[in-house]
Amino acid sequence: MLTFQQIILTLQQYWDKQGCALLQPYDMEVGAGTSHTATFLRALGPEPWKAAYVQPSRRPKDGRYGDNPNRLQHYYQFQVVLKPAPGNILELYLGSLEALGFDLQQNDIRFVEDDWENPTLGAWGLGWEVWLNGMEVTQFTYFQQVGGINCRPITGEITYGLERLAMYLQGVENVYDLVYSKGVNGAPDLKYGDVFHQNEVEQSAYNFEHSDADFLFTAFNAHEKKAQELMEHKLALPAYEQVLKAAHTFNLLDARGAISVTERATYIGRIRNLARAVAASYLDSRARLGFPMAPKAWADEVLAELAKKAAA
């Protein structure tokens, strides 16, 4: 039986062998691995990119005070980004399941069409959910647009839900019963609940009861203003961090019930406008560098298109 941390190590070793850079999590609150710059921004432009990383993900509304056996406000995804998306991406994914010890002949693996969209990031793609014996464990996406910009070449994204995958592999019904790491020399195993249960209880209390809506509204406006200011200085990466801060602040306000249905759409639109502007700013920043990681023919083609668009 693989422990939670061994599942991560196995996936890292597997994707390392496929030529992926093993990156570290983005060090800010994000709702999904897609928000990491290694996916959202690197999907833009003609430069090839292969990376894999664990991303802690926060969704304040999903908190259940540690009482729900499979719903968390803080959880982990394992993200793989392949650009351009290889023709054998499905085989590569199935190979990763075999590396984890799955017998593909003995398990019911289904690909259910499920196109993906993230309105706040202005991103969408063609995709599939992967169901393993009736439980969704992975999302496949071929990015079509990011920040409202068409993706050329297409980026392939594989997102593993680590807790769900581990629950199936370990045969447990409650996420807190997962073995995080094995005890040695007679020490007891460390459980997922030992590491994270208190955090779920306390963060749920903060998200639903103790966050300060007035402070959060002020913070949202400040992050929005700073993002716009940074883009005026052509600082796409710091601006993107402000967008992520604004997005998480919105999620906290949403969890607190401080935003009405009509206001919700307005706030999502404000974040989307920022994300689109940052995406364009980042693409321009790579263009100013001449897309140094791209094959010359690809770089020249996109540079010519951008120049034509600027002259129009």
Swiss-Prot record:
KW Nuclease (keyword) present: no
GO molecular function list: ATP binding; glycine-tRNA ligase activity
Keywords: Aminoacyl-tRNA synthetase, ATP-binding, Cytoplasm, Ligase, Nucleotide-binding, Protein biosynthesis
GO BP terms: glycyl-tRNA aminoacylation
Catalysed conversion reaction: tRNA(Gly) + glycine + ATP = glycyl-tRNA(Gly) + AMP + diphosphate
Chief location bin: cytoplasm
GO CC annotations on file: cytosol
PROSITE patterns in the cross-refs: AA_TRNA_LIGASE_II_GLYAB
Subcellular location: Cytoplasm
SUPFAM superfamilies in alphabetical order: Class II aaRS and biotin synthetases
Enzyme Commission designation: 6.1.1.14
HAMAP family xref list: Gly_tRNA_synth_alpha (MF_00254)
Subunit (UniProt): Tetramer of two alpha and two beta subunits.
NCBIfam families: glyQ, PRK09348.1
Family per record: Belongs to the class-II aminoacyl-tRNA synthetase family.
Name of this chain's protein: Glycine--tRNA ligase alpha subunit
Source species of the chain: Methylobacillus flagellatus (strain ATCC 51484 / DSM 6875 / VKM B-1610 / KT)
